[in-house]
């Protein structure tokens, strides 16, 4: 699958740890989000996840089926073996994950590649790499990732957007109250976890996000 900036517009991230460690609830909410129009999904079974490697693979295969059904690009967080096993469309690499250069060499243009950048130095490094996009944040305080770091704010995000040679997807503390302000940064899109997976009305939340573009 070829990368397009539009993939980043409404980019959902998550795993069973984001739905009370309930894989069934996770799949139900992911399907509702895909049906409502999310533009990408990143399978991220991490942090407080209690799934075994086999369970993570089995759940990932179900996510792959949903992504195929709804035509949603599927990324895997920091696991080349899993990405290959479920035939993901892309992989996302964090600063604390496998070295980005090793990932780029391994995928050899077969997968879309995203890269987390949270400082100006990291963005400058990314500018020298053949990645498809960078994820930058947290824009606002967040509890979805326990290692997220301090918030950049919209102005900090805008500085990174200007510096980056790649499209930027914003992450961290995104809510319906701040979507509009976040988009003024010039970012290509928004990524979220709890805003969608923690919502009572997943489909309604996704549709409201898309309406704000």
Curated annotation (Swiss-Prot):
GO terms for biological process: thiamine biosynthetic process; thiamine diphosphate biosynthetic process. GO terms for molecular function: magnesium ion binding; thiamine-phosphate diphosphorylase activity. 4-amino-2-methyl-5-(diphosphooxymethyl)pyrimidine binds at residues 42-46, 77, 116, 145. Pathway: Cofactor biosynthesis; thiamine diphosphate biosynthesis; thiamine phosphate from 4-amino-2-methyl-5-diphosphomethylpyrimidine and 4-methyl-5-(2-phosphoethyl)-thiazole: step 1/1. Mg(2+) binds at residues 78, 97. It is an enzyme of class 2 (transferase). Its EC number is 2.5.1.3. GO terms for cellular component: cytoplasm. Belongs to the thiamine-phosphate synthase family. Condenses 4-methyl-5-(beta-hydroxyethyl)thiazole monophosphate (THZ-P) and 2-methyl-4-amino-5-hydroxymethyl pyrimidine pyrophosphate (HMP-PP) to form thiamine monophosphate (TMP). This is Thiamine-phosphate synthase. It comes from Limosilactobacillus fermentum (strain NBRC 3956 / LMG 18251). The gene is thiE.
């Amino acid at each position: 699958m070829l990368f397009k900036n539009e993939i980043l517009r409404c980019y959902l991230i998550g795993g069973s740890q984001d739905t009370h460690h309930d894989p069934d609830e996770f799949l139900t909410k992911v399907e509702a989000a895909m049906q409502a129009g999310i533009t990408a999904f990143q399978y991220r079974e991490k942090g407080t996840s209690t799934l075994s490697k086999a369970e993570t693979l089995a759940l990932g295969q179900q996510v792959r089926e949903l992504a195929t059904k709804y035509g949603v690009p599927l990324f895997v967080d920091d696991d080349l073996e899993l990405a290959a096993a479920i035939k993901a469309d892309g992989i996302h690499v964090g600063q604390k994950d496998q070295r980005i250069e090793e990932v780029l060499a391994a995928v050899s243009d077969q997968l879309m590649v995203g890269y987390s950048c949270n400082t100006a130095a990291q963005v400058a490094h990314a500018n020298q790499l053949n990645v498809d996009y960078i994820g930058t944040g947290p824009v606002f305080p967040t509890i979805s990732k326990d290692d997220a770091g301090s918030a950049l704010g919209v102005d900090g995000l805008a500085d990174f957007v200007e510096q980056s040679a790649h499209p930027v997807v914003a992450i961290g503390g995104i809510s319906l109250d701040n979507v509009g302000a976040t988009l003024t940064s010039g970012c290509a899109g928004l990524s979220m976890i709890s805003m969608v997976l923690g919502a009572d009305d997943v489909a309604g939340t996704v549709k409201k996000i898309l309406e704000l573009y």
